[in-house]
């Protein structure tokens, strides 16, 4: 787009507020190719130096019972790379990325419905660091765990933890 940085920032925020992701607005209003956009905005150069997995991450994940499915607004290449660098790729049964949701991000209701249908999820625990995503999950009947240091409470949050390894205390 041929616009100023200031206008781009406003447009980005408007699309984020309206669609839940900048990309969705760019696709709808500017015919932006989502694959080109994602490859540009999720450039993986020097990526290994930026990923710092939490201590006890593998132990924590291995102690989670049932199917473990990643549901992310990130692209597949980016997600796979993070999981591999963190040495936890093989610990997950499935990965559902922004491409799988037709570029419709969480917390969108249709995206959540598509995710649940694809993996035939009727019940489960949804863990996220964004409360809006948890609200959608709760609306679909899932239990919710919010990763946060916030002290506020919301009726759609079942549990709060500060870091993933806190799951070991359950």
Language-model region placement:
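N-terminal helical cap/lid subdomain that shapes the substrate entry/recognition surface
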Residues: 1-55
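Short, contiguous strand/loop micro-motifs
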Residues: 9-11, 44-48, 66, 98-99, ...
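Asp-based, Mg2+/Mn2+-dependent phosphohydrolase catalytic module
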Residues: 35, 58, 62, 69, ...
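Short, surface-exposed alpha-helical recognition segments that flank or form part
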Residues: 48-52, 70, 103
């Amino acid at each position: 787009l041929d616009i100023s940085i200031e206008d781009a920032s406003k447009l980005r925020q408007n699309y984020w507020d309206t669609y839940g992701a900048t990309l969705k607005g760019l696709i709808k209003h500017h015919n932006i190719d989502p694959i080109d956009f994602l490859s540009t905005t999720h450039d993986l150069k020097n990526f290994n130096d930026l990923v710092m997995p939490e201590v006890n991450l593998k132990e924590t994940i291995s102690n989670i019972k049932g199917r473990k499915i990643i549901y992310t607004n990130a692209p597949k290449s980016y997600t796979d790379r993070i999981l591999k660098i963190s040495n936890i790729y093989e610990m997950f049964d499935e990965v559902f990325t922004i491409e799988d949701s037709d570029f419709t991000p969480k917390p969108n209701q249709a995206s959540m419905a598509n995710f649940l249908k694809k993996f035939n999820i009727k019940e489960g625990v949804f863990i996220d660091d964004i409360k809006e995503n948890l609200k959608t999950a709760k609306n679909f009947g899932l239990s919710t765990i919010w990763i946060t240091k916030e002290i506020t409470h919301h009726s759609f949050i079942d549990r709060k933890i500060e870091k993933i390894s806190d799951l070991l205390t359950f």
